[in-house]
């Protein structure tokens, strides 16, 4: 597919502390965070004017699902708009706490693990056609996804029985299957639950749940952009060498524990290869493929960053990407802090730095401190992100949903929406079914809006 629908869902970690002590349970914090949402949406599961979905997931994790985007820059912008929306809820909730005489700070973390060892996810969605075998898609993708953390992991200090280690990925320790229909109990790499949120005869939604939540915008661009290119190669019938792994679940942990990318992992055919070699194989095929096909500026940026990141890992010169790739930015931050204060990697103060990198409150989070200092590269502009909080992408179905919600709210009409349905809850119960996610103009929706 030359034009694809993308979407990102991020679950956020939440806590409330007072002088370092836990003040409210996650359930209570979530209630404060969502009080404003519930007051206008009558639910903790709502769609917003920008076409996104905001809801409270299992285990009191706020989750933000971006609207459908058909280009990577829009996706990065809307992913960041989700952070800003949640930051707004956080500021509101803190005001309410103060009004009720409760002292404490609320923290929202865009990360994937908490101190108790629980994991929550960043789920990537890619629209693919029904043609071709889904199992072949998964077979080719799994070695790519297992090793992809080398180019876009969020980084993590992991406590192990042998001491603390710096890992590439937060999510790797929590993945237990290759392909499965579960998302929480067994946590596969690819989730196979068949919910296309589109015409099921034409489309399928590839649901990847192995990735980390990224703070750095270029890391998000590379995570989704590289995966899109691999999908395009599979769809075009490019012959890719069989890189199947003997045990993907063991391999994903081995890769995560080795930021040099050199550790040998066993292939299904009995040979061995490193994560670096596997990624270089995918990259070289991608470069050949796009040389023949031609490419746009954003795809060029993805290829350039992919190549530079692998070169940085291969040569050990991390300065090549220390403004763009999360695990490298965070590693540099932690190493500088350790050197300044003469601390071991296992120090609780280092764990604090690790966590503070993911704090979405811009006046407090360490990633945003680096952004203010101009120490990280950007993909989006702040104005774009601000606008995306209330404006949907203009080239996908999200535009129809966003316009419908905006008009219904302005006219104070009762309505129900999901990814495909737009419904006015009046006597006639008029409903429009929007099965084509690429369609941003629809006379039926315009009529429904005009009738309000």
From Swiss-Prot:
It is an enzyme of class 6 (ligase). It catalyses: ATP + [prokaryotic ubiquitin-like protein]-L-glutamate + [protein]-L-lysine = ADP + phosphate + N(6)-([prokaryotic ubiquitin-like protein]-gamma-L-glutamyl)-[protein]-L-lysine. Transmembrane segments: none annotated. Keywords: ATP-binding, Ligase, Magnesium, Metal-binding, Nucleotide-binding, Ubl conjugation pathway. Pathway: Protein degradation; proteasomal Pup-dependent pathway; Protein modification; protein pupylation. ATP binds at residues 53, 66, 419. The keyword Transmembrane helix does not apply. It comes from the Bacteria. The active site is at 57 (proton acceptor). Its EC number is 6.3.1.19. One of its GO terms (molecular function) is magnesium ion binding. GO terms for biological process: modification-dependent protein catabolic process; proteasomal protein catabolic process; protein pupylation. Mg(2+) binds at residues 9, 55, 63. The reaction mechanism probably proceeds via the activation of Pup by phosphorylation of its C-terminal glutamate, which is then subject to nucleophilic attack by the substrate lysine, resulting in an isopeptide bond and the release of phosphate as a good leaving group. Catalyzes the covalent attachment of the prokaryotic ubiquitin-like protein modifier Pup to the proteasomal substrate proteins, thereby targeting them for proteasomal degradation. This tagging system is termed pupylation. The ligation reaction involves the side-chain carboxylate of the C-terminal glutamate of Pup and the side-chain amino group of a substrate lysine. Belongs to the Pup ligase/Pup deamidase family. Pup-conjugating enzyme subfamily. PANTHER family: PUP DEAMIDASE/DEPUPYLASE, PUP--PROTEIN LIGASE. This is Pup--protein ligase.
């Amino acid at each position: 597919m030359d034009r694809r629908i993308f979407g990102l869902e991020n679950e956020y970690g939440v806590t409330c502390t007072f002088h370092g002590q836990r003040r409210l349970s996650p359930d209570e914090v979530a209630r404060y965070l969502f009080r404003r949402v519930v007051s206008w949406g009558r639910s903790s599961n709502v769609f917003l004017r920008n076409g996104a979905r905001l809801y409270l997931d299992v285990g009191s994790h706020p989750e933000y699902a971006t609207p459908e985007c058909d280009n990577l820059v829009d996706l990065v912008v809307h992913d960041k708009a989700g952070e800003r929306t949640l930051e707004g809820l956080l500021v509101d909730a803190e005001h309410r706490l103060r009004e009720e005489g409760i002292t404490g700070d609320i923290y929202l973390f865009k990360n994937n693990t908490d101190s108790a060892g629980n994991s929550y996810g960043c789920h990537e969605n890619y629209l693919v056609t029904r043609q071709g075998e889904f199992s072949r898609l998964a077979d080719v993708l799994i070695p790519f996804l297992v090793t992809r953390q080398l180019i876009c992991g969020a980084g993590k200090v992991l406590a192990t029985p042998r001491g603390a280690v710096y890992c590439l990925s937060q999510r790797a320790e929590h993945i237990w299957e290759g392909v499965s229909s579960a998302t929480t109990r067994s946590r596969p790499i690819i989730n196979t639950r068949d919910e296309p949120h589109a015409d099921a005869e034409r489309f399928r939604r590839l649901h990847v749940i192995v990735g980390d939540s990224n703070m750095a915008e270029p890391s998000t661009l590379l995570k989704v952009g590289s995966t899109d290119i691999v999908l395009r190669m599979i769809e075009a019938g490019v012959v890719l060498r069989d890189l199947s792994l003997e045990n993907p679940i063991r391999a994903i942990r081995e890769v995560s524990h080795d930021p040099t990318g050199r550790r040998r992992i066993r292939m299904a055919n009995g040979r061995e290869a490193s994560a670096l070699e596997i990624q270089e194989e995918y990259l070289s095929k991608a470069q050949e493929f796009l040389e023949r096909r031609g490419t746009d500026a954003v795809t060029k940026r993805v290829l350039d960053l992919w190549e530079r990141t692998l070169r940085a890992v291969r040569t050990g010169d991390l300065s090549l990407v220390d403004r763009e790739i999360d695990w490298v930015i965070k590693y540099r931050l932690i190493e500088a802090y350790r050197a300044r204060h003469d601390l071991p990697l296992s120090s609780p103060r280092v764990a604090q730095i690790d966590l503070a990198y993911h704090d979405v409150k811009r006046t407090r989070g360490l990633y945003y401190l680096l952004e203010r200092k101009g120490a990280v590269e950007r993909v989006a502009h702040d104005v774009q992100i601000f606008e995306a909080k209330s404006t949907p992408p203009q080239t996908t179905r999200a535009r129809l949903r966003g316009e419908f919600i905006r008009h219904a709210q302005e006219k104070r009409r009762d309505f129900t929406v999901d990814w495909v349905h737009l419904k006015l809850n009046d006597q006639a119960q008029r409903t429009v079914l929007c099965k084509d996610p690429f369609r941003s103009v629809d006379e039926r929706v315009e009529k429904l809006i005009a009738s309000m």
